[in-house]
Amino acid sequence: MNILTPVAERLPSREEAEEALAVLRRWATHTPASDVAALAPEAPALVYPDLSRAYPRTFTVDEAYKASLPDLQNGPASLIVGAKAVIQHVGISNFRLPIRYHTRDNGDLQLETSVTGTVSLEAEKKGINMSRIMRSFYAHAEQAFSFEVIERALEDYKRDLESFDARIQMRFSFPVKVPSLRSGLTGWQYYDIALELVDRGGVRKEIMHLDFVYSSTCPCSLELSEHARRERGQLATPHSQRSVARISVEVRQGKCLWFEDLLDLVRSAVPTETQVMVKREDEQAFAELNAANPIFVEDAARSFCQALQSDPRIGDFRVVASHQESLHSHDAVSVLTEGPTFAAESLDPRLFSSLYHVG
């Protein structure tokens, strides 16, 4: 006697399952996703194509394929998320590359440089293709630095991105060989410098920033120490501390201000720069130098101001000084600006903490 298995109870073969899946996928190709999901909760996963997991090393991109790639940043205004508002700065920060700088003594230095490039974005534009900023800068990176070279890079990415305003900032550590005070030794002092080219409303400004590290001896503490010695024969020492001034200057149009020129100005204003190579005679000289130039943070700001005012190549400027106190558990700070370029109602909450220079 033969026993027949009902068709409903028979398991489909693999071949039958593959045919059914192919039919389901063909149907899903021309069916709204909501209808596919309504068929069964697991249906969307079943109809998803089987993708290759191996990296296609031999695949090449032709013009037709490139043209088919989605470009969301250049999409219509309907894709904008949030308010349709103008963005003053959008771009990339801290891409690094070696840049060649010319020095005042007719030498060249190649220094690792951190570059930030931004443009303005109109309210009706979705976004920008940020890689264009990098490509524009790289096109000029082999040339020795000058503000004219930066201007050409800025012109390129303003044109490529169809933006009205743009900015390039370059940050690097600039080495200068400096002599000790008395021993005749020399050592390398490194200065944090940043250069900016700002194009806003068709007006361009060249800006240079310099961090200058110096020692500040408190004039009050110096007098109190001398009083103790004189009146009571009591040995006492005044307090002094490492201090930092961030000097920002606008270079007047058509003028050339070398990095070394700005260094000379700030050194003449406050001569107690921290030292590199120090023997005993240098340490004694530094103590004498500090005693001859005691300085409050207010004095420092005004001394830098006087030096900057004396140079006709410098327009607007700002001095931010921080005396990182050895007496107090807080710092003494000052900000002095001249001209509208650096004037601001608000200060960056982390402005003064950015002035700490650590090894």
Curated annotation (Swiss-Prot):
Domain of life of the organism encoding this protein: Bacteria
GO molecular function: GTP cyclohydrolase I activity
Catalytic activity field: GTP + H2O = 7,8-dihydroneopterin 3'-triphosphate + formate + H(+)
Enzyme class: hydrolase
UniProt keyword annotation of Hydrolase present: yes
Site positions (May be catalytically important): C218
InterPro entries according to UniProt: GTP_cyclohydrolase_FolE2 (IPR022838), GTP_cyclohydrolase_FolE2/MptA (IPR003801)
Family designation: Belongs to the GTP cyclohydrolase IV family.
Protein name (Swiss-Prot/TrEMBL): GTP cyclohydrolase FolE2
Native source species: Cereibacter sphaeroides (strain ATCC 17023 / DSM 158 / JCM 6121 / CCUG 31486 / LMG 2827 / NBRC 12203 / NCIMB 8253 / ATH 2.4.1.) (Rhodobacter sphaeroides)
